[in-house]
C-alpha cells in the first residue's frame, strides 16, 4: 500500500515568532487537538524543548488519548529535521501506523500574519489498511480542526 497524504494550510493573525512558540509547546499542541484528543510527552522528555532535542533520535512514546482520557494510540516520536522558528519534520511510527510523517512549516505573510502549512504522510499498519480512505478523511478533518483552534487562540 502506498502512503497517503493530507495537507492543510491556513493563515494565523500573529507574528511568526509567537506562532512558533505556540505550535511547538506541549500546551499549544494539546490545545490544537482538544477536545477530541490530547498527547502526552514521552517519559523523560518533559524538560526538553524543540531547541534542545537531538535530531533523528527517538524521544519515546507519546500517548494519544481520546477526549484526554482513554489511550487509543501512541506516537514513537522522532524529529528528523528542524529549522528553528520556521519548520519541523517528525518521522515516527505508531501502533496504528507503519509510517507517520508530520511536516509543519511557518511562513511570514506580514509582520502580524503567519501562514501555517501541515503535510502528513502516513501508511497504516496491516490491520488498518481497509480503513485507509476513512483515516485520510478523518485526518483531513482533524488538521482543519487543529488549524481553527490555533487561529482562534490568536483571535
Labelled PLM ranges:
Residues 19-23, 29, 62, 79, ...:
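Hydrophobic pocket/interface hotspot
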Residues 15, 84, 109-113:
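Short strand-connecting beta-turns/loops that link adjacent beta-strands
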Residues 154-155:
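Short, linear, compositionally biased motifs with a strong N-terminal bias
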Residues 41-93:
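Glycine-rich portal/gate segments that line the openings of hydrophobic small-molecule binding cavities
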Residues 1-54:
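Hydrophobic ligand-binding cavity/cleft-lining segments
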Residues 89-141:
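Beta-strand/loop substructures that line and gate deep hydrophobic ligand-binding cavities in soluble
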Residues 5-7, 72-76, 98-103:
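Short, surface-exposed coil-to-beta transition loops
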Residues 9-13, 78, 105-107, 121:
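Generic structural detector for well-ordered beta-strands
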Amino acid at each position: 500500500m502506498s502512503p497517503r497524504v493530507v495537507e492543510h494550510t491556513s493563515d494565523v493573525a500573529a507574528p511568526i515568532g509567537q506562532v512558533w512558540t505556540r505550535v511547538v509547546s506541549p500546551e499549544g499542541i494539546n490545545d490544537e487537538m482538544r477536545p477530541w484528543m490530547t498527547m502526552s510527552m514521552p517519559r523523560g522528555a518533559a524538560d526538553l524543548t524543540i531547541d534542545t532535542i537531538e535530531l533523528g533520535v527517538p524521544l519515546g512514546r507519546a500517548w494519544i488519548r481520546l477526549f484526554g482520557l482513554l489511550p487509543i494510540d501512541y506516537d514513537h516520536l522522532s524529529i528528523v529535521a528542524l529549522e528553528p522558528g520556521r519548520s519541523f519534520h517528525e518521522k515516527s511510527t505508531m501502533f496504528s501506523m507503519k509510517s507517520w510523517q508530520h511536516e509543519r512549516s511557518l511562513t511570514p505573510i506580514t509582520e502580524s500574519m503567519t501562514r501555517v502549512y501541515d503535510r502528513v504522510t502516513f501508511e497504516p499498519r496491516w490491520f488498518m489498511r481497509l480503513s485507509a480512505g476513512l483515516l485520510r478523511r478523518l485526518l483531513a478533518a482533524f488538521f482543519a480542526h487543529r488549524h481553527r483552534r490555533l487561529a482562534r487562540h490568536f483571535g
